[in-house]
Amino acid sequence: MVLENIRNFSIIAHIDHGKSTLADRLLEYTGALSEREMQNQFLDKMDLERERGITIKAQAVRLNYRAANGKDYILNLIDTPGHVDFTYEVSRSLSACEGALLVVDASQGVEAQTLANVYLALENDLDVFPVLNKIDLPAADPERVKQEIEDIIGLDAHDAVLASAKEGIGTREILEEIVTKIPPPQGDSNKPLKALLFDSWYDQYQGVIVLVRILDGMVKKGDKIQLMSNRRNYEVLKVGVFSPAMCEVAALSAGEVGFIIAGIKDVQDAKVGDTITSLHNPCDGPLPGFKEVQPMVFSGLYPIDTSQYEQLRDALAKLKLNDSSFSYEPETSLALGFGFRCGFLGLLHMEIIQERLEREFNLDLITTAPTVVYKVHRLDGSIITIESANQLPPVQEIQYVEEPFILASIHVPNEFVGGILALCEEKRGVQREIKYLTPTRVMVIYELPLNEVVLDFYDRLKSITKGYASLDYEHLDYRRSNLERLNIMINGEVVDALSLIIHKDKAYFRGRDLVSKMKELIPRQMFEIAIQAAIGNKVIARETVKAMRKDVLAKCYGGDITRKRKLLEKQKEGKKRMKNVGNVELPQEAFLAILKVEG
């Protein structure tokens, strides 16, 4: 196939704006799927993707289309994840394309994530053209949304395609736009092989399958290839395309998109953004933009039933096979037993992994409150990174602590702006700007500490705005902050699973909330229990669970006071001894409830 007749494109859209449904229509129209095979959201292979309406992994499908001009074209649709946590994956998938469809809901208009991904596309020099979806809805207002696209994004939208993926309206027009507006790929099949790896996953029979976009050269079965980031060498066992089922082809050449199977055993070796080249005739250098993805949010995962520890370990290993951005290592907690400390790209990534563990592997888990990566500058000049409160060195060794900040852009209807500003101020945010995008929609931009966002920011945001807000964020930098470790002590013993790193201004309120919550949850014992919140050696809040009392005087009818006193003294002694040796069992509910205390 000549380069002139190939088009590589992706679809950019906010969650629920109809991206996967539109992809279904394109597959159906070009005959890639028969009516019988058609299932909604065909490209979202995981149940979880379909259910939450999000795309987690990239997919690539080859469509054959005969255009109005009579020529046959190959259209490669690269389906990208649309969520903020997967920004790096999106940017790599986009760099495999020459153009993108910007799908906007004709009733809702432009949302925060749409903006972020459009900017990524423009950074990668893609030609972007808008499509207004859901025009069949009664609330659709195409003219207003066209104006929004022009005002906010700066794209010319006067001739945007009007479509309804659900009803199949506008599908042909979209395909014609792809052929006419998106440029063909550049590349030279005679040069040394240079291919961009933009996704990989594990297949239990064939090892790791990698999705690639060939930029120069060609690759066929039997070739020796090398991954440039780690210099590993492999022999190609199979090359092919998805149409949308896997089809083996003789070779993939410049401009094409397809898969390579080369007996790679570990997804860790096939990193997104890497460059693949020929072992004996390598290209001059790797593609720019490759970076190792670093986890930003950490959380402890513990099985509720300790006998499930091995199952949890196997489950994590299986998930890691398909997700190189997820990391885990074993850790133990005095309170929760054996578990794992896991690293995630962000909150959605964390939720997805937890849900997959519970759903696909039937595990019951406790997750500790999410934390972020802090940088601790010690007095001896060294810098250490920590991701849990238990790793924080003693106060006397610390010079200062830095925490990560993010730049958050929040799109909200204007009646909710007051509530959003109050929430951001409460979360120690620094206001950057407020833009009125339209008379009814506002974009609020804040710098926020990631630590404050990981706990409950998103839930609070949604409840303040009745679900109308959309949030997008990017990582900024590390900043010096006044952070301390807050410990919860029960009868003088520190409960390690409940320690947290918190800003000094909030420590007192958080400590008070935690101890009063625990007072309700810890069952009464035969002796009194002191629950304290402390910073270092200084106790800042305390509650006491009163002891239950057995009436030892019940058998004394009247009689001498000294007899009664003797029995009471004896009871007092017993309680004292009990308090020294008795340890308090914390019920599981106590942990779960504490993790839900408002941040």
Swiss-Prot record:
Record Gene3D superfamilies: 3.30.70.240, Elongation factor 4, C-terminal domain, Elongation Factor G (Translational Gtpase), domain 3, P-loop containing nucleotide triphosphate hydrolases, Translation factors
Family: Belongs to the TRAFAC class translation factor GTPase superfamily. Classic translation factor GTPase family. LepA subfamily.
Database matches in SUPFAM superfamilies: EF-G C-terminal domain-like, P-loop containing nucleoside triphosphate hydrolases
UniProt membrane topology term: Peripheral membrane protein
Name under which the protein is recorded: Elongation factor 4
EC number(s) from the headed UniProt entry: 3.6.5.n1
Function: Required for accurate and efficient protein synthesis under certain stress conditions. May act as a fidelity factor of the translation reaction, by catalyzing a one-codon backward translocation of tRNAs on improperly translocated ribosomes. Back-translocation proceeds from a post-translocation (POST) complex to a pre-translocation (PRE) complex, thus giving elongation factor G a second chance to translocate the tRNAs correctly. Binds to ribosomes in a GTP-dependent manner.
Keywords linked to the UniProt accession: Cell inner membrane, Cell membrane, GTP-binding, Hydrolase, Membrane, Nucleotide-binding, Protein biosynthesis
Compartment(s) where it occurs, according to its Swiss-Prot or TrEMBL record: Cell inner membrane
